[in-house]
Amino acid sequence: LKQSKQPLESCRNRCNETFSEELSYCSCDNKCTERKACCWDYQDICVLPTQSWSCNKLRCGEKRMANVLCSCSEDCLTKKDCCTDYKSICKRETSWLKDQCASSSASQCPEGFDQSPLILFSMDGFRAEYLETWDTLMPNINKLKTCGTHAKYMRAVYPTKTFVNHYTIVTGLYAETHGIIDNNMYDVKLNQNFSLSGSNMRNAAWWGGQPIWHTASYQGLKAATYFWPGSEVKINGSYPTIYKVYNKSTPFEARVMEVLKWLDLPKAKRPDFSTLYIEEPDTTGHKFGPVSGQVIKSLQMADRTLGMLMEGLKQRNLHNCVNLILLADHGMEAISCNRLEYMTDYFNTVDFFMYEGAAPRIRSKNVPKDFYTFDSEAIVKKLTCRKPKQHFKAYLAKDLPKRLHFANNIRIDKVNLMVDRQWLAVRNKKYKYCSGGTHGYDNEFKSMEAIFLAHGPGFKEKTEVTSFENIEVYNLMCDLLKLKPAPNNGTHGSLNHLLKNPFYNPSPAKEQSPPLYCLFGPVPSPDVSGCKCSSITDLEAVNQRLNLIDQAKMQSEADNLPYGRPHVLQHSKYCLLHQTKYISAYSQDILMPLWNSYTISKSLVKPTSAPPSASDCLRLDVRIPTVQSQTCSNYQPDLAITPGFLYPPDFSSSGPEQYDALITSNIVPMYKEFARLWNYFHSTLLPKYATERNGLNVISGPIFDYNYDGHFDPYDTIDQYVNNTKIPIPTHYFVVLTSCENSTKTPLNCPPGSLKVLSFILPHRPDNSESCADKSPDNLWVEERMQTHTARVRDVELLTGLDFYSALKQPLSETLRLKTFLPIFINSVN
């Protein structure tokens, strides 16, 4: 008997077939919907593949057809156009998400991959707190975090804006160095404005530094960018090997598929380095604010995008071959139209141009004509201490906290406002962009913290590291690609602890100037110095205390320099002066110490009576020739400066020890108002910190940065700023406090790798208007001011030409990690 033909009831392998009357009951041509005659699975089999980037059981083994986004056909692996989940859906292989964490000491790369490719993936505006709070809703990102290396957070550079930080990540440069100081700016030398929507954005004159795609190409590698600020600009005359012109409407999935296709290219064309960028969760965070259901959905979208990338890598057997860095440029903060500071509340007429928002700047509106003559100081003065609860502080760029590295560029307008969290500063009440969320604030704010996760054969597994700055990522990427980095602001080797086998081993800085000898000499005549000290009854005995024998000097160094003598990396004439309780490096060039170092215990015992003050008891140091010494007569009343002590005399419990500190080699020039801060810090805060931390090693000294470039001024530059006195006035003072992470240990017996540091770079100014402190008790403002001006030890080194921790018995990369640490003080919403 002849078998009857089974009726067709599916569109499988029939999509876009020619219409047939015989099959009119179950059609799969492109007009069947109009006739309402499609097979039941027409939508899933024929339509969905043109809209979906995923396989499903119905699609597995499908017949090839045009216009599909990706294929689930049997030959898709050969054709290299499979959907990324083809193997897990159609071949029942374990998905990357369900795989166990890989554990291998070596790269697992397929044939043809001699070196692990590197992918840099940015999720714009992904603040670190999102991952802490919503990790269970982001399984792919959470797995990457669990299996690879991640930081608690990565600190953005200031201002915490998109273009600024993306370009910092690929150059290792601060905004002031690479020139992209904001998403909007003016350059008086170019007489041009820069904006994200303007044509000038593609003018290479705006873009400084060497982005990593150029570093790679200059050293024989290939680089591809799927959207990245700067990648479509002809920087230094060239583009990346492959790049895409930005188009925000391009689906995230299309971006991932293209990056994966780059990895399918023949070796001769395949990029060694690729970037991938998506706008979420930033776009949604701006619209709805960081704490919103919409942001959670955008995070899940971002998570699926990562999952698609990892599935695609696994399908190519590259998931344990590729090194992947997943990061963000900045965080996100909630804003409200009820939290606006209007310039019209401070000025009768707002006769200037203002970049409004979370990181405002002010300049002349008539440029270039009035650019240089604009009275910035008058603007700052009118914006200072005007309201009891003012939600911003106005700074001249040169007075901003040094940790921001935001002064040394003509594009940085002189007037800058540091705005409180969740507030905006704007011109007037016409401002409308004040709902939802924004960013740009101080990079120490928790809400501005960004994510950093890394996975691949180059990175350690299941490792959490402490926070670091995004200027360090460029060097890290160069190490993964075995490249020599271009000059940058990062500290090369400080992220070695992220890597299984670090490529670069840092070398100790070479000292330029070893100390000279200052010999104990005859007592100079008091008439020469103008100094007096009537309370000293036996001057010879007091001076003889400064003539320590070698054994006493060694003991002083053990007590006061437990981590080694700071090395001097500039040409300088100085000598070490040993006292029982402190050591100083006295400079013959600037007539004051380069640094003083001492250690105080948890139970600092102060004298029952206050020691004599500098005004009534100060004498010349007999170890310093008179012509190389400060004198009391240098401090004339009309100079508004007073001698301040680097080592406080009242830190010595006995009278004779106090006289060891009442010498001209221990004094530095201070404005009287600054001395308020300095004295309160030493009398109240230092003992408190010493109690909390079981003792402290303290190193402090002057800084000279008159050209505010973040680096120490040469002595001939300093000489230009000495007026009516032979004493140069420091622009800042630094303090470096070192203790032990384990509070049962003291700074003197702390084991290697366990040190904890807290550093400050304090602007030396003649008033305390920054804190509105003229009539305020010191306890209400000093500590907050100091926290504002916290800094990395590395910042102190750059500004002083010193090299700290020279004798630590640990790998240098661990010391660099300590030097690049920036302490954070959690700021409440004001």
From Swiss-Prot:
Its GO biological process annotations read: nucleoside triphosphate catabolic process
Q: What does the UniProt keyword field contain? A: Disulfide bond, Glycoprotein, Hemostasis impairing toxin, Hydrolase, Metal-binding, Platelet aggregation inhibiting toxin, Repeat, Secreted, Toxin
Q: In which tissues is it expressed?
A: Expressed by venom gland.
Annotated a divalent metal cation 2 binding lies at: D124, T162, D329, H330
- Every copy of the SMB domain together lies at 7-50, 51-95
Details of cofactor binding:
Binds 2 divalent metal cations per subunit.
The record, for SMART domains, names: Endonuclease_NS, NUC, SO
Q: Where is this motif: Cell attachment site?
A: 35-37
Show the catalytic activity. ADP + H2O = AMP + phosphate + H(+)
Glycosylation positions? N16, N193, N236, N247, N489, N723, N742
Q: Mind telling me which GO cellular component terms the entry cites?
A: extracellular region
Q: What domain of life does the UniProt record list for this protein's source?
A: Eukaryota
Residues that coordinate or bind AMP:
K248, H286
Active site per UniProt:
T162 (amp-threonine intermediate)
| GO molecular function terms noted in the UniProt entry | ADP phosphatase activity; metal ion binding; nucleic acid binding; nucleoside triphosphate diphosphatase activity; toxin activity
Cross-referenced Pfam families: Endonuclease_NS, Phosphodiest, Somatomedin_B
Q: Which EC class does it fall in? A: hydrolase
Which residues does a divalent metal cation 1 bind?
A: D282, H286, H439
**Which cofactor names does the annotation list?**
a divalent metal cation
Q: Does the keyword Secreted apply?
A: yes
Tell me the disulfide pairings in this chain.
C11-C15, C11-C28, C15-C46, C26-C28, C26-C39, C32-C38, C39-C46, C55-C60, C55-C72, C60-C90, C70-C72, C70-C83, C76-C82, C83-C90, C101-C147, C109-C321, C337-C434, C385-C772, C518-C575, C531-C632, C533-C617, C740-C750
- Fill in the subunit field for this protein: Monomer cleaved in two subunits; disulfide-linked. Is synthesized as a single-chain protein and is subsequently cleaved to form a two-subunit protein held together with disulfide bonds.
Q: Which family does it belong to?
A: Belongs to the nucleotide pyrophosphatase/phosphodiesterase family.
Described by its record, this protein's role is as follows: Hydrolyzes ADP with high activity. Shows weak or no activity on 5'-AMP, 5'-GMP, 3'-AMP, ATP, cAMP, and cGMP. Is devoid of monophosphatase and proteinase activities. Dose-dependently inhibits platelet aggregation induced by ADP and collagen.
Give the protein name, as stated in the record. Venom phosphodiesterase
